[in-house]
């Protein structure tokens, strides 16, 4: 079987100075996505993807690790300033924002964009433990 010897073009890394960090914190997992101003994803990470499984996925430490991984990947694009959009009620909200600040990002604003229904779909029944 012959090997494919065609040369592949390297994709040039864009230089982006400002970005938006989308933090989706659910009760089961935390997803951190860093995008440019137009919404094109530069880097993303999840607490489940960092090796945390089961109930450890939903811890603040797992969200912190996911934010660090996504933040380091976005720094390769030259991102310095970020706006943070936090969505969801999960336990990883604050720790993910703190982790991004500790990486050296200048956090311009923090916004809560959790969707709140104006009496939409019926909520799931309450747990009886």
UniProtKB/Swiss-Prot annotation:
GO biological process, one term: translation
Origin: domain of life: Bacteria
Keywords, in A-Z order: Ribonucleoprotein, Ribosomal protein, RNA-binding, rRNA-binding
Single GO cellular component term: ribosome
InterPro entries: Ribosomal_uS11 (IPR001971), Ribosomal_uS11_bac-type (IPR019981), Ribosomal_uS11_CS (IPR018102), Ribosomal_uS11_sf (IPR036967)
Keyword Metal-binding part of the UniProt annotation: no
GO molecular-function terms, A-Z: rRNA binding; structural constituent of ribosome
Keyword DNA damage attached: no
PROSITE patterns to which the protein is assigned, alphabetical: RIBOSOMAL_S11 (PS00054)
Pfam families, alphabetized: Ribosomal_S11
Family membership: Belongs to the universal ribosomal protein uS11 family.
PANTHER family tied to this protein: 40S RIBOSOMAL PROTEIN S14/30S RIBOSOMAL PROTEIN S11
Self-association state and partner proteins as the record states: Part of the 30S ribosomal subunit. Interacts with proteins S7 and S18. Binds to IF-3.
Role of this protein: Located on the platform of the 30S subunit, it bridges several disparate RNA helices of the 16S rRNA. Forms part of the Shine-Dalgarno cleft in the 70S ribosome.
Protein name: Small ribosomal subunit protein uS11
Organism: Psychrobacter arcticus (strain DSM 17307 / VKM B-2377 / 273-4)
Gene that encodes the chain: rpsK
């Amino acid at each position: 079987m012959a090997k494919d010897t065609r040369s592949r073009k390297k994709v040039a890394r864009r230089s982006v100075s400002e970005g938006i960090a989308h933090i989706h914190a659910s009760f089961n997992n935390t997803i951190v996505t860093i995008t440019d101003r137009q919404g094109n994803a530069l880097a993303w990470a999840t607490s489940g993807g960092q090796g945390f499984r089961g109930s450890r996925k939903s811890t603040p430490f797992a969200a912190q690790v996911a934010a660090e991984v996504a933040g380091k990947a976005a720094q390769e694009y030259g991102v310095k300033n970020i706006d943070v959009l936090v969505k969801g009620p999960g336990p990883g909200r604050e720790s993910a924002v703190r982790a991004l600040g500790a990486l050296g990002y200048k956090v311009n604003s923090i916004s809560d964009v959790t969707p709140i229904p104006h009496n939409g779909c019926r909520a799931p029944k309450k747990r009886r433990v």
